[in-house]
Amino acid sequence: MKNILSIQSHVVFGHAGNSAAEFPMRRMGANVWPLNTVQFSNHTQYGHWTGCVMPASHLTEVVQGIANIDKLKTCNAVLSGYIGSAEQGEHILGIVRQVKAANPDALYFCDPVMGTPEKGCIVAPGVSDFHCQQSLLAADIVAPNLPELELLGGRTVHNVAEAVETARALCEKGPKIVLVKHLSRAASREDSFEMLLVTPTDAWHISRPLVEFERQPVGVGDLTSGLLLVNLLKGVALDKALEHTTAAVYEVMLVTKEMNEYELQLVAAQDGIANPRHHFQAVRLS
């Protein structure tokens, strides 16, 4: 069984960050070691929340505790998501180096959350620069959405072809795999939800139906990153990993819609996460 050190935000109520990714990754058969960058009452898109950002040193101290009991060598991957400060990010890269020293085969999967102010997702000053200048170079796998892809790539992306070009340019800086979690306005169709998985030599495109909500649930990207990582650690081929991730997230969205809920209904959808009823084919791009 694979072990994932998941360094992300945590909400007490609802699902975002570790609160969105931890249970689905466990349901997929991975051991998850959740390490929280922030602890908030709820996610920030409610407009009101309480809680705190963890000191950057807290992250390092906790991981050192794991090293002290000689278990860091069993860590197969570090997954990072929302960070509360650029200083936290620098400490996370130190943790990645420490994990890789203990297990050279360990992967670093970076979900470079840079904030979407118009949706209420705000990151601290310096976080975007940290991702562009540091985490991108250290990551084995990076999973931006479209605005994050544009920031990382330093260009505007208008269509699928340009998204592939930009993702492949990122591969030249460090990552072996780039997952574009949501093509949004660069998608080939307005009525579909589309993603890309890009390596230096290959690219796959996948689409599924959009599930419309009055208020779009939060944590979908965190869920997506976690599921893809588990699939990759299991040795699933890239295209099949993308297909399962897409179908599993779709199952969660359908159940959440059916239950008329704002928060992702992960427990109710757990069987669909492990064994999706729907299938979407990843198309290899020439």
From Swiss-Prot:
It catalyses: pyridoxal + ATP = pyridoxal 5'-phosphate + ADP + H(+). GO terms for molecular function: ATP binding; magnesium ion binding; pyridoxal kinase activity. Transmembrane segments: none annotated. The keyword Transferase applies. Its EC number is 2.7.1.35. Pathway: Cofactor metabolism; pyridoxal 5'-phosphate salvage; pyridoxal 5'-phosphate from pyridoxal: step 1/1. Disulfide bonds: none annotated. Its cofactor is Mg(2+). One of its GO terms (biological process) is pyridoxal 5'-phosphate salvage. One of its GO terms (cellular component) is cytosol. Keywords: ATP-binding, Kinase, Magnesium, Nucleotide-binding, Transferase. Pfam families: Phos_pyr_kin. ATP binds at D111, A143, E148, K181, R208, P209, L210, V211. Substrate binds at S9, T44, Q45, D222. The keyword ATP-binding applies. InterPro entries: PM/HMP-P_kinase-1 (IPR013749), PyrdxlKinase (IPR004625), Pyridoxal_kinase_PdxY (IPR023685), Ribokinase-like (IPR029056). Homodimer. Belongs to the pyridoxine kinase family. PdxY subfamily. Pyridoxal kinase involved in the salvage pathway of pyridoxal 5'-phosphate (PLP). Catalyzes the phosphorylation of pyridoxal to PLP. PANTHER family: PYRIDOXAL KINASE. This is Pyridoxal kinase PdxY. It comes from Pectobacterium atrosepticum (strain SCRI 1043 / ATCC BAA-672). The lineage of its organism: Bacteria, Pseudomonadati, Pseudomonadota, Gammaproteobacteria, Enterobacterales.
